[in-house]
């Protein structure tokens, strides 16, 4: 059974999160040190998806009084398509606007985000590197979760 746990300021879990990134991405977008630093931030929290003791997915969020930004979301390949990303997304606050950025070429992620009531609001040119690509900025309004 998959269990979702919300954590904050637990840099000791960085290795497990990094392992998910390494399994999902060809090259992890963040280093282990960046994840550890992010896990130490006051305004950052993570939702982790566990299969028994193994972290199989996560959602990284930076939140303030008025809004939240999805920094990362990833689920290991063997667990994709089972509703885990939606369960992670369900941890987001419904009383705040939610923002995120996604690669223009990542149509699968964009379709998922639209299913989660996110809408395209802008584009950032040449935002990503390796490869260089534009970012699509998406937003979910308050109470549309």
Residue ranges of predicted features:
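Conserved acetyl-CoA-binding loop-helix of GNAT-fold acetyltransferases
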Residues: 75, 81-94, 108-115
């Amino acid at each position: 059974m998959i269990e979702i746990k919300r954590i904050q300021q637990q840099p000791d879990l960085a290795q497990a999160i990094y392992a998910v990134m390494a399994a999902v991405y060809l090259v992890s977008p963040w280093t282990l040190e960046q994840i550890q630093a992010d896990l130490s931030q006051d305004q950052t929290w993570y939702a982790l998806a566990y299969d028994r003791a193994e972290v199989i997915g996560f959602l990284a969020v930076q939140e303030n009084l008025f809004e939240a930004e999805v920094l990362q979301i990833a689920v290991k390949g063997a667990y994709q398509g089972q509703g885990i990303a939606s369960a992670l997304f369900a941890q987001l606050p419904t009383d705040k606007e939610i923002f995120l950025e996604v690669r223009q070429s990542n149509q699968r992620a964009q379709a998922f985000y639209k299913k989660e009531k996110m809408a395209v609001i802008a584009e950032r040119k040449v935002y990503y590197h390796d490869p260089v690509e534009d970012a699509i900025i998406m937003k979910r309004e308050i109470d549309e979760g």
